[in-house]
Amino acid sequence: MKILLCIVLLLVVLTLFAVWPGKRRDALRAPFLGRNCAHRGFFGKDQRPPENSLPAFVAAAKNGYGIELDVQFTADRRIVVFHDDTLDRMTPAKGFVHDMPWAEFSAQPLAGSDEHPPLFADMLRTVAEANPDTPLIVEIKSRSEYNHTYLEELCRATIAELKTYPGPYCIESFDPRVVGIVRRQAPGLLRGQLADSYRSYRKTGAHPVPAFVFSHCLGNFLGRPDFIAWCPEKRNWAVRLCARLGAMMVMWTALPEHDTRKLEAENDAVIFQWYAPKQQYK
């Protein structure tokens, strides 16, 4: 009985160590609290303007919203704003973004429009000109095959470009390794751990073990995130524990069919898509 009790206690301690978020840093949180942030910019279901395009970002900034966006490397290490790992959904091309050089990638039309994928630097400059106070939530894209050196270079380059932006910003990622690297490279920067539900991870083909680890924020010990960005599904016990331990709660992605008032009441910030909420709800 004593051995069993010790095992249970050890598991509790290890779980707490794994999921414990970072210390509250209210000054860093303040620009994001109660804000509605446009997911990949302010765009419609018809992709006019296209997601993650300069017009979508300008529309979000001029309407007073925060902006969520995605960054990754091209083959020649240019930081671009693009969500998918592959090009086929948003462009006529095929293949991975990280395998295509910038000159070829930049020529691809977005969703059949006259717009093209922007460089991160151009996006930052454009938003600063439209509304320099726009809060930015920057998701660093990652894949399991990316090694530590590659991710360190991507994080370092992203952070360097963000330093040119006059407004508030933070970094998030689904990959706890990225959050950990940001913690080491820029400890004074607000950082967040993105998480999806176990069911969603399994639907995309993830093995049960990593699906459980990622959905239950068991990689938080690497980055000690300031916030957890959680999906529309009911929070699991680990996400609820993070909230109780002081993590800022961000919701992604609120859609028109959701109870958006409830989501705003339950979260410190909301990442929305395909509707026009108030800029600030708290």
Predicted segments, located by residue:
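Phosphate-group recognition and catalysis centered on beta-loop-alpha active-site segments
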Residues: 2-282
